[in-house]
Amino acid sequence: IHKPGDQNRNQKGDLAFNYKNIPVSVEVKSVAKNTIKQNLFGWSGKAAVKSSDKKVLTFSDGSTADVAMLPRGQFTILAVCCHAFTGSWKDFQYCLNTDLPMPNSGSLTELQKSELISVLIPVQWPPVAPFTTDLQSVLDRAIQ
């Protein structure tokens, strides 16, 4: 397990390791306290998944956009700490990068949206698909 350097453009995420000889990277975020609401099923909130600065990204069709959103595929798994919901630093939920929502910005084309991750990711406690507390199942899906 290692932490890729912040300036490493080839490997992103907060943790990187090999799982069954396949490289996996995990981006770790937490639920923003100011987004938490109690509902009939438990708790809901949002995790902010974004770049620290806006940057110009080039998309597969050659178009560009100046955004703070992260490109899809830059890490393998999103891990969200759910301390704000449960009071425990041990409670996490996990989701594959490919299952995260696209942004709904009107200034982006459909192709650009499909290649980006939404900045605010909705999460609930207890977790609702595509999130799960079962990291093993997400790791197994990641290497398929």
Q: Each PLM stretch: what is its role?
A:
Residues 27, 79, 93-95:
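Residues in well-ordered beta-strands of folded domains
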Residues 10-12, 21-23, 72-74:
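Short connector loops at helix/strand junctions that flank enzyme active sites
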Residues 17-27:
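Active-site beta-strand-loop-beta-strand hairpin of nuclease catalytic cores
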Residues 1-18:
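A short acidic/basic microdomain associated with nuclease active sites
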